């Protein structure tokens, strides 16, 4: 018996068997079986014919932990294998999963399992986007520290994910609010600062005048009032930190051409960035001939003509007129609403040293999102009119040659260059001097990352009265958050109140200084997390370059379409920056994107706009009405939320239907990019329940056939039965090909399930002789279970346990001593891939099948040749000769041609 135990391997721990009376008689030892698993084969050694809700639950209880343990034993260290990095967007730890989470993580889990079965080295990591405003609100409302609230939520949500049977690479778990993560967020910020890509300027914030604090946009209600105090929110200028994302606009716009798999998202990214045709240039400002130390950045679409500048224009809403600028009074004195106003302020171009006046424009809105632009009459008729109206001096700097070529004149070293060459040379020089020159659009703004919050990554800057803003030395990172005992939601940034933390020494001169009290936008934390997953425990750097280069780019990134613009833009920006810093070799972070749709619930709304709970709705009539008032209700499908009373608790539906059923429902109900209208009464849920039952029944028939005492003998099959088996072989290969394509190319997992349902339907029609004697049936049944396993891992694991111990198998290419999830993904048989020399072409006349004729393969896709071939065939002569044929139609998908004729 020792050799039998060795051969059983994996299943030896599950089952014991005795062989008595020959190889085809199986008896199972008596033993005490836990009550919760009395009905399943893996526990009892007896296959039950019925697949009930209790069976499903017993199967999942038995296999849940075992599947998890299998996954944890798979090594991710074998770099000789091709890799596959599947990443689903990590969640904010709100404390409870919703069905949207279940959908995205079911998709990523399914793809990860599939890729492992293909022999890929796979990571499917999970972590927590753990900083953010809700934790701080909880601190104010419930007197809970943000850290304890967050960690408690993470603990609960991790258990929820585990109960869903999701096998993440938990050893790679990251949490953005932990110092070992945000240390490296701070490190990257300092690298940006050193590269001139992080800077401060004044910007508008939402200000609560009662609580004396800054509000996030989501803390301002639809009436413009504070969520907490109810005060009318004011707009106030504060000095804020920005990341100069415009510096990478052109590179990121151009790189979209290298992302063919970003279906539907590339256009959104391109629109967000805009047409990158110009650049910003920096100016120093003077008033009445005196330098002020202040700077102004302005945009031009024609930087090559910068020597023809007549003025710099600002909008009436510009920060210089409303913030804390020393120029505000001089500018306001010059302002006449509704008129273009010349001011006493002069702007000195930091590249050309030209000095031109600042003009306040009459119009409030400039092009794109601009609030300042450079006036160049040589390239703008509007600028010409304004300069002439205000009597401003300027030079014509563009001359047109007889052949139409435009060249520069009166433009210092750029004189004589074509406009195109001058554009490149001048912007390059500006970038080299760090006075602008980054090619960008007139609509893209730099990224404001300052938040006047506690629960965020501290900005690692010290403000020194002597040295100015000074980055914290890298060896002193992380700058950790101080422990603040209570939160009131009043009085500005909580960090500003932590005097012991704020007051420090300047890293440069060692004099008295103060820490920056703003924290970073949480989008900064999530802009580089995909890198950290590749090397999550590295204490010396954000990630090891060689390790990141192996895993990157992410092969498939899955998340909601609502993140298709801002988050992806910021993530791409950080990846481009890290590439330029020689930290990684790949510029783009994500190869393929899958933007999954929402799961929507049904809502019932009164004419007043109030949403009702389902218990308040009378559904007995032809239209839903309010149970009390009998008012007619507006019925819609909307994103699930508590306020709309249309949410579904994932734990409740899993308890009711089982994990595999919910997984299959989510995957089958709609293509992943489409919305799902959650309604368990639709065809989708009954369909996947029936399909699981069919898989179980197919297995039962096969086990019974092989346990009948008869040995399988393929030579006993009749010609008709051999033809039946051949069709199963063809069907199996066709399904393998199509399902593999769905898993690797379009991710239409609903279509993959449909294909597998079709194969199970074909197998259920098989005759008893084919089931017993045909290797084709056995192979197709096993391939079906292997292909279904990534989507329904529990039920297929149980089925495979039953199949594994069926005696006298005819297929030797499966590894029977390991579970179904460790099988190799089925491959299409080479014979199936060989195109036949002759195709059997189905001929239809007026949509009625009339027979088939053999057509040479090289002719079968040519409409005209097939048409003539059919007419000259015996069938064509007999059925079509002398009849009026309008036109024939050759199917692009199948070997079929239809002849509409007039009798």
UniProtKB/Swiss-Prot annotation:
Question: What GO molecular function annotation could you give as one example from this UniProt entry?
Answer: aminoacyl-tRNA deacylase activity
Q: Which reaction does it catalyse?
A: tRNA(Leu) + L-leucine + ATP = L-leucyl-tRNA(Leu) + AMP + diphosphate
Family annotation (NCBIfam families): leuS_bact
**Chain span(s) of sequence motif 'KMSKS' region:** 639-643
Q: What is this protein called?
A: Probable leucine--tRNA ligase, mitochondrial
Family the entry assigns: Belongs to the class-I aminoacyl-tRNA synthetase family.
Kindly list the positions at which N6-acetyllysine occurs in this protein: 68, 236
Task: State the organism named in the record.
Answer: Pongo abelii (Sumatran orangutan)
Please list the residues that bind ATP: 642
List keywords of the entry alphabetically: Acetylation, Aminoacyl-tRNA synthetase, ATP-binding, Ligase, Mitochondrion, Nucleotide-binding, Phosphoprotein, Protein biosynthesis, Transit peptide
Its EC number(s): 6.1.1.4
In this chain, where does the modification Phosphoserine occur?
711
Locus of motif 'HIGH' region: 92-102
Fetch the CDD domains from UniProt: Anticodon_Ia_Leu_BEm, LeuRS_core
The record's SUPFAM superfamilies line, in alphabetical order, gives: Anticodon-binding domain of a subclass of class I aminoacyl-tRNA synthetases (SSF47323), Nucleotidylyl transferase (SSF52374), ValRS/IleRS/LeuRS editing domain (SSF50677)
Location comes to: Mitochondrion matrix
């Amino acid at each position: 018996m020792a050799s039998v135990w060795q051969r059983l391997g994996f299943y030896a721990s599950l089952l014991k068997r005795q062989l008595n009376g020959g190889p085809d008689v199986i008896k199972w030892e008596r033993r005490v079986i836990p009550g919760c698993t009395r009905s399943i084969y893996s526990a009892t050694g007896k296959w039950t014919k019925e697949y009930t809700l209790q069976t499903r639950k017993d199967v999942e209880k038995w296999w849940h932990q075992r599947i998890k343990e299998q996954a944890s034993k798979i090594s991710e260290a074998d770099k000789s294998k091709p890799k596959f990095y599947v990443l689903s967007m990590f969640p904010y730890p709100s404390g409870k999963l919703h069905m949207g989470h279940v959908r995205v993580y079911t998709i990523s889990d399914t793809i990860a399992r599939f890729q492992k079965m293909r022999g890929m080295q796979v990571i499917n990591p999970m972590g927590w986007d753990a900083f953010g405003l809700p934790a701080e609100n909880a601190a104010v409302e419930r007197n809970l520290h943000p850290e304890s609230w967050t960690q408690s939520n993470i603990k609960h949500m991790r258990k929820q994910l585990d109960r869903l049977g999701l096998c993440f690479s938990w050893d790679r778990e990251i949490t953005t609010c932990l110092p070992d993560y945000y240390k490296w967020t701070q490190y990257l910020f300092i690298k940006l600062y050193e590269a001139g890509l992080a800077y401060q300027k004044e910007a508008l914030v939402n200000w609560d005048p009662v609580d004396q604090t800054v509000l996030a946009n989501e803390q301002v209600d639809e009436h413009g009032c504070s969520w907490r105090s109810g005060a009318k929110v004011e707009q106030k200028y504060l000095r804020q930190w920005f990341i100069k994302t415009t510096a990478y606009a052109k590179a990121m716009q151009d790189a979209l051409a290298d992302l063919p798999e970003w279906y539907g998202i590339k256009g959104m990214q391109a629109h967000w960035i805009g047409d990158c045709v110009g650049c910003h240039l920096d100016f120093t400002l003077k008033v009445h001939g005196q330098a002020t130390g202040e700077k102004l950045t302005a945009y031009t679409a024609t930087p090559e003509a910068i020597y023809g500048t007549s003025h710099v224009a600002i909008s009436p809403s510009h920060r210089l007129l409303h913030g804390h600028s020393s120029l505000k009074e001089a500018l306001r004195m010059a302002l006449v609403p509704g008129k273009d106003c010349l001011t006493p302020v002069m702007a000195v171009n930091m590249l050309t040293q030209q000095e031109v006046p600042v003009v306040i424009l009459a119009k409030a809105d400039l092009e794109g999102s601009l609030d300042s632009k450079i006036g160049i009459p040589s390239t703008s008729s509007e600028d010409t009119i304004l300069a002439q109206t205000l009597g401003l001096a300027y030079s014509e700097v563009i001359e047109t040659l007889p052949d139409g070529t435009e060249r520069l004149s009166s433009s210092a070293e750029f004189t004589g260059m074509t406009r195109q060459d001058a554009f490149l040379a001048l912007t390059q020089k500006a970038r080299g001097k760090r006075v602008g020159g980054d090619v960008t659009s007139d609509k893209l703004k730099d990224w404001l990352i300052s938040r006047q919050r506690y629960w965020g990554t501290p900005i690692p800057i010290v403000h020194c009265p002597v040295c100015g803003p000074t980055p914290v030395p890298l060896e002193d990172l992380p700058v950790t958050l101080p422990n603040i005992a209570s939160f009131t939601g009043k009085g500005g940034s909580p960090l500003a109140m932590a005097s012991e933390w704020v007051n420090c020494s300047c890293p440069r001169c060692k004099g008295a200084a103060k820490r920056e009290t703003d924290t970073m936008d949480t989008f900064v934390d999530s802009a580089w997390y995909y890198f950290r997953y590749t090397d999550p425990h590295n204490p010396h750097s954000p990630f090891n370059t060689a390790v990141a280069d192996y895993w990157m780019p992410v092969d498939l990134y899955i998340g909601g379409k609502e993140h298709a613009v801002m988050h992806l833009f910021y993530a791409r920006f950080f990846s481009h920056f890290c590439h330029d810093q020689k930290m990684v070799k790949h510029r783009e972070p994500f190869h393929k994107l899958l933007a999954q749709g929402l799961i929507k619930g049904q809502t019932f709304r009164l004419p007043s706009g109030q949403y009702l709970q389902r218990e308040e709705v009378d559904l007995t009539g032809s239209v839903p009405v309010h149970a009390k008032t009998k008012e007619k209700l507006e019925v819609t499908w909307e994103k699930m939320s508590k306020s709309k009373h249309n949410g579904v608790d994932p734990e409740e539906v899993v308890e009711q239907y089982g994990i595999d059923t919910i997984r299959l429902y989510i995957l089958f109900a709609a293509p992943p990019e489409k919305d799902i209208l959650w309604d368990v009464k639709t065809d989708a849920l009954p369909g996947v329940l029936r399909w699981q039952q069919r898989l179980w029944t197919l297995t039962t028939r096969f086990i019974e056939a092989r346990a009948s005492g008869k040995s399988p003998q393929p030579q006993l099959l009749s010609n008709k039965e051999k033809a039946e088996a051949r069709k199963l072989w063809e069907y199996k290969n066709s399904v393998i090909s199509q399902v593999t394509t769905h898993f690797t190319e379009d991710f239409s997992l609903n279509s993959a399930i449909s294909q597998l349902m079709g194969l199970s339907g074909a197998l259920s029609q098989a005759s008893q002789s084919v089931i017993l004697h045909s290797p084709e049936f056995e192979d197709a049944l096993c391939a079906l279970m292997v292909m279904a396993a990534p989507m329904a891992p529990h039920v297929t694991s149980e089925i495979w346990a039953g199949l594994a111990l069926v005696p006298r198998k005819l297929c030797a290419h499966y590894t029977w001593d390991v579970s179904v999830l460790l099988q190799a993904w089925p491959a299409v048989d080479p014979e199936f891939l060989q195109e036949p020399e002759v195709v059997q072409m189905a001929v239809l006349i007026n949509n009625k099948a009339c027979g088939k004729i053999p057509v040479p393969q090289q002719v079968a896709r040519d409409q005209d040749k097939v048409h003539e071939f059919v007419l000259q065939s015996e069938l064509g002569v007999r059925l079509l000769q002398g009849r009026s044929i309008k036109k024939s139609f050759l199917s692009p998908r199948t070997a079929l041609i239809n002849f509409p004729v007039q009798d």
